[in-house]
From Swiss-Prot:
Domain Chitin-binding type R&R span(s) in chain numbering: 39-100
InterPro entries with a match to the protein in the record: CHIT_BIND_RR_consensus (IPR031311), Cuticle_Struct_Prot (IPR050468), Insect_cuticle (IPR000618)
Record protein name field: Larval cuticle protein 2
Entry GO MF terms: structural constituent of chitin-based larval cuticle
Gene Ontology CC terms: chitin-based extracellular matrix
Keyword annotations: Cuticle, Signal
Amino acid sequence: MFKFVMILAVVGVATALAPVSRSDDVHADVLSRSDDVRADGFDSSLHTSNGIEQAASGDAHGNIHGNFGWISPEGEHVEVKYVANENGYQPSGAWIPTPPPIPEAIARAVAWLESHPPAPEHPRHH
């Protein structure tokens, strides 16, 4: 339950801090909202008139699966799916930045180092 509250807080803060580019965002209405909290987990969802969406499901073990999304200032639908479990928060989506590929020379150097471990050091006596 703690993870659920934390994730909703993060989503809420991110939504609150996002720059508002359209005047109708200020007057967005909640079109639908559902919260079902049970002993074995929960389900929740939210949909607003300006395109903000959120849905999450959790189980009694603290595992949560969900997604959230909004309409960008460019008019594109941004969606992030996530899993939160014993391995932490794991977001995925086309909008999540990815690191650039490792340069070929670096990859070769790492492969060489892995195939040639250093010789064991012998203690020196004085």
